[in-house]
Regions:
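Membrane-proximal interfacial segments on either side of biological membranes
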Residues: 1-193
Length: 193
């Protein structure tokens, strides 16, 4: 059996080594070398920010390989002072030769007014938000993410989920921002009633 645990702290973390499918870590995952019940490996990294992205701070990246399963449960980050994100029930696996990350995200809203300002949401639709829970699936090779099963303040809304299920984020950051803002505002309007 192989047991190891690595902990580290840095000012900035470069996530391209973890999420770019051509980098060494994703390539190792594709070999399925970690699908071994004798490997028990934990990697925990804390960072003040993400390289080339000043919006996200206080990153805690926790990864674990145990019993041939790979997850990033309890990984966290903050979007400025607006919201905190926490990942749970995650699993990284290979499907048809592609690396997939499935999981759940809990978003704790710190300042909903700042989020509404960022989204340019009309004032008459701005309701106070506390938490958002949702499922997600990220394909490392296609650089795409889909969202599902959204609950706002522990309430499931069919209309919001129909809108959120339309969200598929691709690699183009500018297009994603505009597309995401428009769809999120559509969901907020539905939530506001």
């Amino acid at each position: 059996p192989f047991y190891s645990s690595l902990n580290g702290k840095t000012q900035k973390i470069d996530l391209t080594y973890l999420i770019n499918s051509n980098e060494i870590i994703p390539q190792l995952l594709k070999t399925e070398i970690f699908n071994n019940k004798n490997i028990d490996f934990k990697l925990n990294i804390k960072a003040d920010s993400i390289r080339n992205n000043f919006n996200f701070v206080n990153i805690v990246f926790n990864s674990k390989i145990q019993e041939a399963l790979i997850d990033i449960d309890n990984s966290k980050l903050e979007w400025k002072n607006f919201a905190r994100f926490n990942i749970s029930d995650s699993l990284i696996y290979i499907n048809d030769g592609q690396i997939i990350l499935d999981g759940k995200i809990k978003i704790e809203i710190i300042d909903s007014n700042e989020i509404y300002k960022y989204l340019l949401t009309p004032k008459n639709y701005r309701k106070n938000l506390n938490t958002i829970d949702m499922g997600f699936s990220y394909n490392f090779d296609e650089k795409s993410m889909s969202l599902k099963d959204i609950n706002i303040d522990k309430i499931y809304n069919e209309n919001i989920n129909k809108i959120i299920n339309k969200i598929i984020l691709k690699d183009n950051n500018l297009q994603n921002r505009i597309y995401l803002k428009n769809l999120l505002n559509e969901a907020i309007k539905s939530y506001a009633g």
